């Protein structure tokens, strides 16, 4: 992976990565990866929270969108960023989201 100063991560994504760690060594690996590739962790703002709640109302039933993914999508939209994820099912239907899906 090429280093760049243009990498952003929702605080929600960061917390999900840490949550999946099995031990402190894996926590350190996640933190070191985020730091070494210059990711900027974006906070949850009032606007992100509001937009995420709208996404839940609109997309939770038809696409199964959950709160964490709504926060991630809202963070991307509020910061005018393209969201890149393999979670195509939950994100592809969000109309105002710039989304690029991939298969791992």
Regions found by a protein language model. Give the residues of each.
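PIN-domain endoribonuclease scaffold, especially VapC-family toxins
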Residues: 1-63, 67-81, 98
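Short, active-site-adjacent cap segments at secondary-structure transitions
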Residues: 16, 90-91
């Amino acid at each position: 992976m090429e280093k760049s100063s243009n990498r952003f991560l929702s605080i929600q994504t960061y917390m999900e990565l840490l949550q999946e760690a099995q031990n402190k060594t894996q926590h350190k690996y996640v933190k070191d990866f985020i730091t070494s590739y210059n990711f900027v962790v974006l906070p949850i703002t009032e606007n992100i929270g509001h937009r995420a709640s709208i996404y839940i109302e609109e997309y939770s039933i038809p696409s199964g969108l959950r709160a964490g993914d709504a926060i991630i999508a809202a963070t991307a939209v509020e910061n005018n960023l393209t969201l890149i994820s393999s979670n195509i099912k939950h994100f592809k239907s969000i109309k105002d989201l710039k989304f690029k899906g991939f298969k791992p």
